[in-house]
């Protein structure tokens, strides 16, 4: 392995590791702040965490899960074997299709948020603290978050394919603020 490749590998590894560590620290601070500022005596903390489960599930599927894992090798193949215009067309079609799917899921999610809450947390139905209503309201607000986080993850996959690792590694830290 050439010294240039070793340096590039080391630089990219340190960049991604550093930004991942920063992201984890920001995530810890965020979770601590949530715990401190949302008293669980009213059940608000439980409602908050339930409302975040569904968008985070979609984030794992569309953002950081199967889609990104499948997309990077396909895009890399296009990048290495096709003309620049074909690659750009593939990227445009991919983003357009994903945007359409995420908009549909977001709109449906906003409309059926209370039903989803009662399916995931049936104990909220007769809660003395109206946790179901609070969680449903929070979930309605979180579906647009799901749209943006999933789209951001696909854009990060594109950047990774083009050997740009700093911005995709830093993005989770910004989203934890």
Task: Identify the residue ranges that each predicted region occupies.
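Membrane-embedded alpha-helical bundles of multi-pass transporters/translocases
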Residues: 1-177
